[in-house]
Protein backbone atom coordinates (compact mmCIF):
# COMPACT_ATOMS: atom_id res chain seq x y z
CA UNK A 1 0.00 0.00 0.00
CA UNK A 2 3.03 2.21 -0.36
CA UNK A 3 1.56 4.09 -3.35
CA UNK A 4 -1.24 5.62 -1.26
CA UNK A 5 0.76 5.91 1.95
CA UNK A 6 1.74 9.37 3.13
CA UNK A 7 1.60 11.62 6.18
CA UNK A 8 0.11 15.09 6.41
CA UNK A 9 2.00 17.55 8.59
CA UNK A 10 0.17 20.42 10.27
CA UNK A 11 2.20 23.34 11.62
CA UNK A 12 0.78 26.68 12.83
CA UNK A 13 0.83 29.37 10.16
CA UNK A 14 1.90 27.01 7.37
CA UNK A 15 -0.03 25.08 4.73
CA UNK A 16 -0.45 21.37 5.36
CA UNK A 17 2.49 19.42 3.93
CA UNK A 18 2.37 15.93 2.42
CA UNK A 19 5.26 13.66 3.51
CA UNK A 20 6.06 10.46 1.63
CA UNK A 21 7.80 7.43 3.17
CA UNK A 22 11.61 7.73 3.12
CA UNK A 23 13.47 5.70 0.54
CA UNK A 24 15.79 3.95 2.98
CA UNK A 25 16.52 3.40 6.65
CA UNK A 26 19.73 5.37 6.24
CA UNK A 27 17.68 8.53 6.61
CA UNK A 28 16.76 7.80 10.24
CA UNK A 29 18.27 10.68 12.18
CA UNK A 30 19.87 12.14 9.05
CA UNK A 31 16.87 13.44 7.14
CA UNK A 32 16.72 16.77 8.97
CA UNK A 33 19.08 18.64 11.27
CA UNK A 34 18.13 18.11 14.90
CA UNK A 35 16.35 21.16 16.27
CA UNK A 36 15.01 21.78 19.76
CA UNK A 37 14.76 18.61 21.88
CA UNK A 38 11.38 17.08 22.62
CA UNK A 39 11.72 17.96 26.30
CA UNK A 40 14.19 20.06 28.26
CA UNK A 41 12.92 18.50 31.47
CA UNK A 42 14.02 15.26 33.07
CA UNK A 43 10.79 13.65 31.94
CA UNK A 44 8.74 12.93 28.84
CA UNK A 45 4.96 12.90 29.24
CA UNK A 46 2.81 11.11 26.69
CA UNK A 47 -0.93 10.65 26.16
CA UNK A 48 -2.16 7.71 24.07
CA UNK A 49 -5.81 7.67 22.98
CA UNK A 50 -8.13 6.21 20.38
CA UNK A 51 -10.29 9.31 20.02
CA UNK A 52 -13.17 7.55 18.16
CA UNK A 53 -13.15 10.08 15.28
CA UNK A 54 -14.21 12.77 17.79
CA UNK A 55 -17.77 11.45 17.65
CA UNK A 56 -18.49 12.05 21.34
CA UNK A 57 -18.76 15.25 23.31
CA UNK A 58 -15.93 16.33 25.65
CA UNK A 59 -13.06 14.97 23.54
CA UNK A 60 -11.61 18.47 23.21
CA UNK A 61 -11.80 19.19 26.95
CA UNK A 62 -9.94 15.91 27.64
CA UNK A 63 -7.19 16.96 25.23
CA UNK A 64 -7.05 20.45 26.69
CA UNK A 65 -6.88 19.20 30.29
CA UNK A 66 -4.53 16.26 29.83
CA UNK A 67 -2.87 16.70 26.44
CA UNK A 68 -1.54 20.24 26.63
CA UNK A 69 1.09 19.30 29.24
CA UNK A 70 2.20 16.23 27.31
CA UNK A 71 5.28 16.29 25.09
CA UNK A 72 3.67 13.70 22.83
CA UNK A 73 0.03 12.89 22.09
CA UNK A 74 -0.52 9.69 20.12
CA UNK A 75 -4.06 9.57 18.74
CA UNK A 76 -5.77 6.79 16.82
CA UNK A 77 -8.92 7.31 14.72
CA UNK A 78 -8.10 11.02 14.66
CA UNK A 79 -10.20 12.88 12.12
CA UNK A 80 -8.63 16.08 10.81
CA UNK A 81 -11.55 18.34 11.65
CA UNK A 82 -10.84 22.07 11.96
CA UNK A 83 -11.26 21.81 15.76
CA UNK A 84 -8.61 19.09 16.14
CA UNK A 85 -6.16 20.73 13.72
CA UNK A 86 -6.59 24.05 15.53
CA UNK A 87 -5.91 22.43 18.92
CA UNK A 88 -2.89 20.57 17.54
CA UNK A 89 -1.23 23.55 15.87
CA UNK A 90 -1.96 25.90 18.79
CA UNK A 91 -0.38 23.59 21.39
CA UNK A 92 2.30 21.62 19.51
CA UNK A 93 5.12 22.43 17.13
CA UNK A 94 4.09 19.66 14.76
CA UNK A 95 1.17 17.31 14.15
CA UNK A 96 1.63 14.40 11.75
CA UNK A 97 -1.27 12.27 10.57
CA UNK A 98 -1.37 9.18 8.35
CA UNK A 99 -4.78 9.06 6.62
CA UNK A 100 -5.91 5.44 6.86
CA UNK A 101 -9.00 6.12 4.79
CA UNK A 102 -10.60 9.30 3.55
CA UNK A 103 -14.09 10.03 4.77
CA UNK A 104 -16.28 12.40 2.74
CA UNK A 105 -14.79 15.45 4.47
CA UNK A 106 -11.93 14.72 6.80
CA UNK A 107 -9.34 11.91 6.65
CA UNK A 108 -9.06 9.63 9.68
CA UNK A 109 -5.98 7.79 10.98
CA UNK A 110 -3.19 7.85 13.54
CA UNK A 111 -1.94 11.32 14.46
CA UNK A 112 1.09 12.26 16.56
CA UNK A 113 1.27 15.70 18.17
CA UNK A 114 4.74 16.66 19.34
CA UNK A 115 6.49 19.43 21.26
CA UNK A 116 9.42 19.22 18.82
CA UNK A 117 9.78 18.88 15.07
CA UNK A 118 10.50 15.28 14.06
CA UNK A 119 13.82 14.65 12.33
CA UNK A 120 12.37 11.56 10.63
CA UNK A 121 8.86 10.58 9.56
CA UNK A 122 7.71 7.28 8.06
CA UNK A 123 3.98 6.62 7.44
CA UNK A 124 2.78 3.00 7.18
CA UNK A 125 -0.57 1.45 6.17
CA UNK A 126 -2.06 -2.03 6.10
CA UNK A 127 -5.43 -3.02 4.63
CA UNK A 128 -7.90 -5.11 6.59
CA UNK A 129 -8.71 -8.15 4.44
CA UNK A 130 -12.39 -8.44 5.37
CA UNK A 131 -13.72 -4.87 5.42
CA UNK A 132 -11.00 -3.59 3.03
CA UNK A 133 -10.44 -0.63 5.32
CA UNK A 134 -6.89 0.50 6.02
CA UNK A 135 -5.25 0.90 9.41
CA UNK A 136 -2.27 3.19 9.76
CA UNK A 137 0.91 3.54 11.78
CA UNK A 138 3.42 6.37 12.03
CA UNK A 139 7.11 6.30 12.94
CA UNK A 140 8.65 9.61 14.00
CA UNK A 141 12.01 10.44 15.59
CA UNK A 142 12.77 13.35 17.94
CA UNK A 143 15.97 14.70 19.50
CA UNK A 144 16.41 14.37 23.27
CA UNK A 145 18.49 16.74 25.44
CA UNK A 146 21.20 14.08 25.89
CA UNK A 147 21.73 13.99 22.07
CA UNK A 148 20.01 10.61 21.77
CA UNK A 149 17.16 10.24 19.30
CA UNK A 150 13.77 8.96 20.50
CA UNK A 151 11.77 6.83 18.06
CA UNK A 152 8.00 7.04 18.54
CA UNK A 153 5.68 4.51 16.87
CA UNK A 154 1.96 5.31 16.85
CA UNK A 155 -0.04 2.20 15.92
CA UNK A 156 -3.64 1.37 15.08
CA UNK A 157 -3.58 -2.36 14.35
CA UNK A 158 -5.88 -4.14 11.92
CA UNK A 159 -9.04 -5.30 13.63
CA UNK A 160 -10.98 -7.68 11.38
CA UNK A 161 -8.91 -10.55 10.01
CA UNK A 162 -9.01 -14.33 10.09
CA UNK A 163 -5.98 -15.69 11.91
CA UNK A 164 -3.01 -13.46 12.73
CA UNK A 165 -1.18 -13.37 9.39
CA UNK A 166 -2.30 -9.85 8.45
CA UNK A 167 -1.89 -8.72 12.06
CA UNK A 168 1.71 -9.95 12.11
CA UNK A 169 2.29 -8.56 8.61
CA UNK A 170 1.44 -5.06 9.86
CA UNK A 171 4.07 -5.38 12.59
CA UNK A 172 6.86 -6.37 10.15
CA UNK A 173 7.66 -2.92 8.68
CA UNK A 174 7.40 -1.45 12.19
CA UNK A 175 9.98 -4.00 13.31
CA UNK A 176 12.24 -3.02 10.41
CA UNK A 177 12.12 0.59 11.57
CA UNK A 178 12.84 -0.24 15.23
CA UNK A 179 15.64 -2.65 14.29
CA UNK A 180 17.46 0.15 12.44
CA UNK A 181 17.24 2.50 15.43
CA UNK A 182 19.78 2.24 18.24
CA UNK A 183 18.23 4.79 20.62
CA UNK A 184 15.22 4.73 22.94
CA UNK A 185 11.81 3.73 21.59
CA UNK A 186 8.16 4.28 22.55
CA UNK A 187 5.60 2.15 20.68
CA UNK A 188 1.99 2.76 21.66
CA UNK A 189 -1.57 2.79 20.41
CA UNK A 190 -4.62 0.63 19.83
CA UNK A 191 -3.28 -2.84 19.02
CA UNK A 192 -6.67 -4.58 18.81
CA UNK A 193 -5.16 -7.55 20.67
CA UNK A 194 -8.54 -9.08 21.46
CA UNK A 195 -7.60 -12.75 20.96
CA UNK A 196 -4.94 -14.97 22.45
CA UNK A 197 -3.15 -15.47 19.09
CA UNK A 198 -3.05 -11.69 18.56
CA UNK A 199 -1.79 -11.13 22.10
CA UNK A 200 0.88 -13.79 21.60
CA UNK A 201 1.97 -12.22 18.29
CA UNK A 202 2.19 -8.78 19.92
CA UNK A 203 4.16 -10.01 22.94
CA UNK A 204 6.49 -12.02 20.70
CA UNK A 205 7.12 -8.91 18.59
CA UNK A 206 7.82 -6.83 21.71
CA UNK A 207 10.32 -9.42 22.95
CA UNK A 208 12.09 -9.52 19.59
CA UNK A 209 12.39 -5.72 19.65
CA UNK A 210 13.56 -5.70 23.31
CA UNK A 211 10.52 -3.64 24.28
CA UNK A 212 9.00 -3.63 27.76
CA UNK A 213 5.30 -3.17 28.46
CA UNK A 214 4.10 -0.30 30.65
CA UNK A 215 1.99 -1.67 33.53
CA UNK A 216 -1.06 0.14 34.86
CA UNK A 217 -1.94 -0.53 38.51
CA UNK A 218 -5.58 0.61 38.26
CA UNK A 219 -6.03 -0.89 34.81
CA UNK A 220 -9.12 0.72 33.29
CA UNK A 221 -8.06 0.17 29.68
CA UNK A 222 -10.74 -0.62 27.09
CA UNK A 223 -11.16 -4.38 26.76
CA UNK A 224 -12.63 -6.77 24.22
CA UNK A 225 -13.22 -10.41 25.18
CA UNK A 226 -11.51 -9.59 28.47
CA UNK A 227 -8.27 -8.44 26.85
CA UNK A 228 -6.90 -4.87 26.78
CA UNK A 229 -6.67 -3.20 23.37
CA UNK A 230 -4.36 -0.26 24.12
CA UNK A 231 -0.69 -0.67 25.05
CA UNK A 232 2.49 1.31 25.62
CA UNK A 233 5.83 -0.41 25.01
CA UNK A 234 9.26 1.14 25.50
CA UNK A 235 13.00 0.63 25.67
CA UNK A 236 15.94 2.79 26.77
CA UNK A 237 13.75 4.83 29.17
CA UNK A 238 12.44 4.62 32.73
CA UNK A 239 8.74 4.75 33.64
CA UNK A 240 7.98 7.28 36.39
CA UNK A 241 4.17 7.15 36.37
CA UNK A 242 1.44 5.38 34.42
CA UNK A 243 -2.32 5.83 34.70
CA UNK A 244 -5.55 5.38 32.77
CA UNK A 245 -8.04 8.23 32.58
CA UNK A 246 -11.66 7.07 32.74
CA UNK A 247 -13.82 9.13 30.41
CA UNK A 248 -16.93 8.93 28.23
CA UNK A 249 -15.37 11.17 25.58
CA UNK A 250 -14.45 8.09 23.48
CA UNK A 251 -15.01 4.35 23.48
CA UNK A 252 -11.38 4.04 24.69
CA UNK A 253 -9.81 5.49 27.84
CA UNK A 254 -6.64 7.58 27.40
CA UNK A 255 -3.32 6.26 28.73
CA UNK A 256 -1.02 8.72 30.51
CA UNK A 257 2.63 7.77 30.95
CA UNK A 258 5.60 9.76 32.21
CA UNK A 259 9.09 8.56 31.26
CA UNK A 260 12.50 9.80 32.26
CA UNK A 261 15.19 9.61 29.59
CA UNK A 262 17.90 8.93 32.17
CA UNK A 263 19.83 5.69 32.40
CA UNK A 264 17.50 2.85 31.44
CA UNK A 265 16.54 0.14 33.89
CA UNK A 266 18.79 -2.89 33.88
From Swiss-Prot:
Pfam family, one: Exo_endo_phos
SUPFAM superfamilies with a match to the protein in the record: DNase I-like
Domain of life the protein comes from: Bacteria
GO cellular component, one term: cytoplasm
Major location category of this protein: cytoplasm
Disulphide connectivity of cysteines: none
Similarity section: Belongs to the UPF0294 family.
HAMAP family: UPF0294 (MF_01119)
Name under which the protein is recorded: UPF0294 protein YafD
Species this protein is from: Salmonella typhimurium (strain LT2 / SGSC1412 / ATCC 700720)
